[in-house]
């Protein structure tokens, strides 16, 4: 699930990146948070399509 805290932190890091740059640790955190966000979006899309996001995808 995508929480507002997750979105807020992603936005904070984005703003800092544009203003003054990020440390290596912040860059790693940013990547991790973005991946978590994308995973949540994919789950939401699959759920709306009627597929179980926890199941393995079908190979067509």
UniProtKB/Swiss-Prot annotation:
SUPFAM superfamilies: YnzC-like. InterPro entries: DUF896. It comes from the Bacteria. One of its GO terms (cellular component) is cytoplasm. Gene3D superfamilies: Helix hairpin bin. It is found in: Cytoplasm. Keywords: Cytoplasm. PANTHER family: UPF0291 PROTEIN CBO2609/CLC_2481, UPF0291 PROTEIN YNZC. Belongs to the UPF0291 family. This is UPF0291 protein Nther_1806. It comes from Natranaerobius thermophilus (strain ATCC BAA-1301 / DSM 18059 / JW/NM-WN-LF).
């Amino acid at each position: 699930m995508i929480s507002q805290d997750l979105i807020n932190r992603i936005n904070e890091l984005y703003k800092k990146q544009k203003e003054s740059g990020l440390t290596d640790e912040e860059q790693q955190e940013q990547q991790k948070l973005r991946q978590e966000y994308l995973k949540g979006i994919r789950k939401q899309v699959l759920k709306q399509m009627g597929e179980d996001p926890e199941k393995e995808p079908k190979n067509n």
